[in-house]
Amino acid sequence: IVNKNYYMKKFSLFLFSFLSLLYAQSDNSSLVVANVDSDTLRFQLKPIEVVGFLNSTNPVLTPFSITSLTAKQLSFGQRGMTLGESLRSVPGLFAMNDENFAQDIRISIRGFGSRSAFGIRGIKLFVDGFPQTTADGQSQVDNINLSYIQSAEVIRGSASSIYGNASGGVIQLFTEPYPNKTQIKSSISAGSFGYSNIQSSIGNGASNQKYLLKVSSKKYDGFRDNSEMSSFNLNTKSLFELNKNSQLSIHYNYVNSPISNDPGSLNKEQADDNRRSARIQNINYQSGEKVLQHRLGASYQLKVSTSSKLEIISFYTDREFSNKLPFENGGQVNLKRSYWGIGAKYVTDNYLFTHPISTTIGADISDQSDRRKRYNNIRGDRGSKVFDQLESFRNNAFYFQQSYLLNNKINVIWGSRWDNDKIESLDYYISDGLGSGFTSLNNASPFAGLTYLLNKSMSIYTNYSNHYETPTLNELSNDPDSLSVGGFNPKLNPQISNSLEIGSKGYVNNYFYYDVALFRSKIDNEITSFELEESPGKTFYRNIGESQKEGIEISLSSSIGNNITLNLGYTYSKFEYANYVKNNKNLNGNRLPGIPQNTFNSDIYYINPNGYFIMVGLTRYGIIYLNDLNDHEIDPYSILNLRIGNEYKLFGSKLKVHIGANNLLNANYFSNLRVNAWGGRFYEPAPQANIYMGTEVIF
């Protein structure tokens, strides 16, 4: 038996040798790519700037794993249907469900979020600083227009000490900047399986009152039966420069998705027989969803002095959601959600014993209210009401962070966040209100990190962090107890984790960037998903005793020639149950399902200054277990994608064209895997080779 620390010891030896080699290759006297005093980067490989991680902008000084993505990864020639297309290359991040828009994309970071049956759990999502994650930890991205996103940052690891509940990782998305003059864009894309996307935008950023408006209409027939979708999306933002020290930004988002059908999952025999088929129950019960959502946000920024600034944000979301599930009892859900919040953050820079110290203090208040009703699903028709409950989740929080540059070599960061969560259910179905309940949770999430500069462009770092995650309101309301008459599942509790990380990152010889991280997390009360025989297709949740997650993440980026960039990434994930007994079976040492043990990614970009580009991406996924017992798995598979495009200048305007091809190797893989599904229905097949093309005109 291989000792469980074997890989960690091997990695430590590799890290030491790797750093020694890099350090020997660097020349401190001539290599000036990271300036500590000015916090800027100068090198031939385009610099990374961290803009979403509180008050830190230099990744070499930051003792955390952060991946920054630019427009070439996010939007150049992409189909633009799901966020997973853009985040595929991030180490430690695993995305599924690019084809089932009724279930929404599933994203996990270092295993956090892997339990989700639909949407995103366990990680926080922001757009231009506004939270897209509700107070209880749910994120849906059906309202995000991916062509509107210009850059992104991913914090790979626990961040509850900064962002609170369900922050096993953080995804920060930033929309495109205001154009320097009045600019109009129009684009159209089309592709396999009835895909189409029509978009238009107008904006102007030349004055102190800037604006940008973008609309899009998407349709998709789907690879599988009963997988059609359509949506209309509108985004607008305005920036008002009130004076030289303050500005006000207002953002509005609207989405109307009247149809997103759910083809359901299949067992292995059904998937092998006909990959395009839908589960017959999903057709009979007309499974799918529709969404209508409005979101409004405002941000005020004030430069208090030359060394301090204040930011205040507020937001409100109104969401109406209804779906049909592939069973009768409670198989139709109607949800009306209101979610609002306000946050304030003050940052000041000073000196302590002649050394720079930066302090951030902040407070957040958010309130989520879900009116959830369930009806019987009579083969697509609404039956009698069987559930009616008002669920609320209120969060009050305070946090602080300090960053202290001890000398020109050592930077220390520490801080904590204190959260109070009030969770309540009011039963409107049973007249005596027996289903009502209330609980209050308090949590402190400390963290500390240290960075040591090997030279001006390379560093090693370590950090410790604490992460807590409450069950979402949806998870709490799905009580597996057949005698339950409403309220929340009293046996479902928050999970708590403690994480330790070491790593190194930096730039070598003006053309090479590396990022290597080793992490380990211990999770108590890990929340897992499962199904019951009497309710196939409905997901329930439970706590297991303990799990351990440890892994290695490596990413390399290099300019290998004129206009050519090569990105490589590797992730090793060893996520195991440590204290879990199920049906009298000891599952200690079993791997957590739904996550590949090994992932390798390779992207090569050629971008000609005249506008021509070609991008090739290859991703290799290792074995993925499908249930807690580890007696079902899928074999390793590889995905090869290609994007080609060009830009033409015509009469003062620009014409862009692109064509893309996905899964060129014709792999028979699965776009989604339903963990612990009853009856072996784990599989949602993905399409084989498919193409798309598009054009855009910029006036």
Where are these regions (language model features)?
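Transmembrane beta-barrel wall of Gram-negative outer-membrane proteins
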Residues: 192-219, 224-262, 288-305, 353, ...
